[in-house]
UniProtKB/Swiss-Prot annotation:
Residues 1-22 form the signal peptide. PROSITE patterns: PROKAR_LIPOPROTEIN (PS51257). It is found in: Cell membrane. Belongs to the MG067/MG068/MG395 family. It is a lipid-anchor. A lipid is attached at C23 (S-diacylglycerol cysteine). InterPro entries: Mycoplasma_peptidase_DUF31 (IPR022382), Uncharacterised_MG067 (IPR022381). GO terms for cellular component: plasma membrane. It comes from the Bacteria. This is Uncharacterized lipoprotein MPN_585. It comes from Mycoplasma pneumoniae (strain ATCC 29342 / M129 / Subtype 1). A lipid is attached at C23 (N-palmitoyl cysteine).
């Protein structure tokens, strides 16, 4: 499948931060500022709008026994596709960029070629898109004895499993010079000794893009679009052209900038987490008092 993506407008937000002072309105946890919804005037708002928590639940068969594993990651909006009005029930498609090791958790037998996984030993059973946000955007806080202004990490199950739009693996035709052939042989031997199924591992970039279909007939999917994706699209459009972002500054100039990293890492933290399910035995809404994936921001200054 070939997908042409829009300009990487979200990159502009990184550089816009270099001209602003850090905001101290965040909760502090170790070296991070966490669990805060930035206002529209705060420097982290653009990145907050574009970032999402990704949760994959996979069913794995081991020694004849079925087990479930959960993998977490962070994704950010990179593109979208409006529904085709000529096609009945055609979904809105959001494209989220993420790390390749995160996207590798997606095991979808219906995925696009060449990403379709044919391993019968396991597959992704549920996918959730999450964000640290206002509880009232999705449910009444009173249901859980929470105040009206309550905030939590809200994880929402999409009605269908995502697909892989792009994975930056085996995308370069590498031919090794004579002096590197011995090194290549050692690499192949290491791969063989590591018992990996892929004996021809090639260089890759830590980057992938997931396609998230959202159906208007699904009440929960509509909430995902209204409260997660639509604000991200507005922010994306606001950022504008980033094609020439590296055109003028030299590398030495770029080293002087301050860079902010925002996301949903796996950290132990006491913050409420709300889950909205569309399928399974626990279909509906339930709350977990604590979560291990807080919304956080940190910065790096070279």
């Amino acid at each position: 499948m070939l997908v042409v993506f829009k300009r990487l407008g979200f990159i502009v937000s990184i550089f816009s931060l270099t001209f602003l002072s850090a905001c101290a309105a965040f909760d502090k946890w170790q070296e991070f500022y966490i669990n805060n919804i930035p206002s529209s005037t705060e420097i982290h708002r653009f990145n907050y709008d574009l970032n999402f928590s990704l949760t994959f639940t996979n069913r794995i068969t081991s020694n004849g026994e079925a087990k479930f594993s959960v993998t977490y990651g962070t994704g950010w909006l990179i593109d979208w596709k409006e529904p085709d009005k000529k096609k009945e029930n055609d979904p809105f498609r959001a494209y989220l960029a993420t790390n390749l090791h995160v996207a590798a958790s997606l095991i979808n037998p219906q995925d696009y070629e060449p990403y379709k996984n044919k391993d019968d030993a396991g597959w992704t059973t549920t996918f959730r898109l999450g964000k640290y946000t206002k509880v009232s955007d999705f449910v009444s806080p009173n249901q859980f004895g929470l105040p009206n202004a309550a905030q939590a990490l809200v994880n929402v199950q999409t009605s269908v499993i995502p697909k892989t739009a792009f994975a930056a693996r085996d995308f370069v035709d590498y031919s090794f010079p004579q002096e590197q052939k011995d090194k290549e042989k050692r690499k192949q031997q290491w791969v063989k000794n590591s018992h990996t199924k892929n004996s021809d591992v090639q260089p890759f970039a830590e980057f992938a893009i997931l396609e998230i279909p959202l159906f208007s007939k699904s009440k929960v999917d509509r909430k995902i679009f209204n409260h997660f994706i639509q604000p991200a699209i507005r922010t994306y459009k606001q950022l504008g052209d980033s094609l020439n972002i590296f055109a003028n500054p030299t590398l030495d100039q770029l080293k002087q900038n301050r860079y902010y990293v925002l996301g949903y890492p796996f950290l132990k933290n006491k913050v409420s987490s709300l889950f909205l399910n569309q399928t399974g035995k626990k279909k509906g809404i339930f709350r977990r008092k604590y979560t291990n994936i807080p919304w956080k921001t940190s910065y790096y200054l070279n």
